[in-house]
């Protein structure tokens, strides 16, 4: 793995030889672990040039628009697989056989119920609390209800916790929504698949149970797949860092939810809807497109381009197809959705956006789909957290399965040098 060497020359010091590591794909990595012995650290705010870990789970090539889960292109998984099969893949490294899939799906279904006492836990939150605030609290509290699987050094405990989290996230997410509306919380149904069950718990009531549209269930399943993992982003890195301290899995996932809540990370599709609100009407599109082109104007078109993908977002094509299917299924006459489709058409053909590869991304289409299905904007990041849980827990599992150290980033200190304490009476 370390076939090459790099040499670091620091003025006044002897050259330092550092191993260069090569992965199966992607850039080579300079191993700086030996640098500490020389009395030097590296400085990389935001870790933009730092590989914090070795991983076999997800690979991204932003320049080529590639996203692979365990080697499989995301487009193929979204088209040919389903969410629980993708979960199995992320957790175990290989696609399941028919028997393995049946057993895994059955295990997840057996864990979808939550402890009845958890319902009373919700009463401690205001009904108008942001759903992500409630999610952070409830998921963190699961360790108080399921403390029979908290030994992180026991592979069986880790597996049970992973299954419980994947199974219970849709139930808890739907409970959060129902609590905010003052409606009765719905129990999961084992005769429904993962996405159908979520929509059932979100939109059905004890007095009226409607069949779930296969088109909407498929759309929801694809949203889950397309958000299942995205390598070492802020929330995944947070989960790994929390996990490195030996924290229990529920606490680690709660930390990931907290990081995802940040608008710079998990709020992108929510920002798309806010932008559409700001534009207001189809007649205003040209004006706002010009504002987006003006470098001196603070207005930005949300849901176009991507920080990682410099060419195109491989998830966006699948999401656009899904968006078209949902809108056709529902036949909604919504001015905001009409505005979104018009904006998409302009951005896909305007030379300014085409030349800069500012195409609609997965957040643009997923926001439209979720709104069309009837999910309120405040729940968008909750859906993201639900889908991303398998990615977080897979990275947590991977870290604990091998040698690891507690995360301890260093700093470039620029504060005061040592000084003596001054008594209060002597301070100017």
UniProtKB/Swiss-Prot annotation:
It holds the Pfam family Citrate_synt. Gene3D superfamilies: 2.20.28.60, Citrate Synthase, domain 1 (1.10.580.10), Cytochrome P450-Terp, domain 2 (1.10.230.10). The keyword Transferase applies. Its EC number is 2.3.3.16. GO terms for molecular function: citrate (Si)-synthase activity; citrate synthase activity. One of its GO terms (cellular component) is cytoplasm. CDD domains: EcCS_like. The active site is at 265, 306, 363. It comes from the Bacteria. The keyword Repressor does not apply. It catalyses: oxaloacetate + acetyl-CoA + H2O = citrate + CoA + H(+). PROSITE patterns: CITRATE_SYNTHASE. Pathway: Carbohydrate metabolism; tricarboxylic acid cycle; isocitrate from oxaloacetate: step 1/2. One of its GO terms (biological process) is tricarboxylic acid cycle. InterPro entries: Citrate_synth-like_lrg_a-sub (IPR016142), Citrate_synth-like_sm_a-sub (IPR016143), Citrate_synthase (IPR002020), Citrate_synthase_AS (IPR019810), Citrate_synthase_bac-typ (IPR024176), Citrate_synthase_sf (IPR036969), Citrate_synthase_typ-I (IPR010953). Allosterically inhibited by NADH. Keywords: Allosteric enzyme, Transferase, Tricarboxylic acid cycle. Belongs to the citrate synthase family. Homohexamer. Citrate synthase is found in nearly all cells capable of oxidative metabolism. This is Citrate synthase. It comes from Pseudomonas aeruginosa (strain ATCC 15692 / DSM 22644 / CIP 104116 / JCM 14847 / LMG 12228 / 1C / PRS 101 / PAO1). The gene is gltA.
